[in-house]
Amino acid sequence: MIRLVIAEDQALVLGAIASLLALEADLDIVGRAADGAEALDLALKLAPDVLLTDIEMPHLSGLDVAAQLMAAQSPVKVLIVTTFGRAGYLRRAIDAGVGGYLLKDSQADRLADAIRRVAAGLRVIDPEIAAAAAFAPADPLTDRERAVLRLADEGRSNKEIGRALSLSPGTVRNYLAEAGAKLGAANRIEASRIARDHGWL
């Protein structure tokens, strides 16, 4: 029996995925999470074989959850199921130790098979995303530039970003300028859009 935690912030989608997977005799859904922080907590407490998670969720992204599980040396394997087929997300997922990456439009039997394969220690990647990632540019941003851009993308001021990241407003301005230059962006809004479109945020 494969023990599974499902993390998805849209209640209807969470219910649909859980209902489909409940039909599989060898899959046991031991927990459901509505955001990234809850997903991380359940994964650490329940130690399922597989955490099935979306990427973009409140509090922590699925990529952040995967990275924290890897940092904690957790044996929980992570399978990302998302609407975002961005090559940058796939690269970050692989760097975070994710075992699988599928799009939400995958067939139910393909999803169940991917869970089994990831639980067995194999890697499963949607072929379309893998092909796109092979030719996509590498992420030029540092972790700090990405964190600053992420908060700028939420509409926060330099002062608010500085408070959140323990940086001075001048340092925030420098990180935004460096990120903008790397991305060829005229301003912070354009830099955020470019980074988001590539899956780097």
Please give the residue ranges for each predicted region.
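Recognition helix of helix-turn-helix DNA-binding domains
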Residues: 155-190
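Short hydrophobic/Thr-rich beta-strand motif most characteristic of the beta2 strand and flanking loop
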Residues: 26-34, 42, 185
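Short, flexible helix-to-coil linker/hinge segments that flank and couple to helix-turn-helix
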Residues: 88-147, 200
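Active-site beta3 strand of CheY-like receiver
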Residues: 46-52
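The feature encodes the CheY-like receiver
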Residues: 13, 32, 58
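Active-site residues of response regulator receiver
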Residues: 54, 82
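Short amphipathic alpha-helix used as the core "switch/output" element in two-component signaling
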Residues: 41, 63-75
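Acidic catalytic/metal-coordinating carboxylates
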Residues: 35-38, 59-65
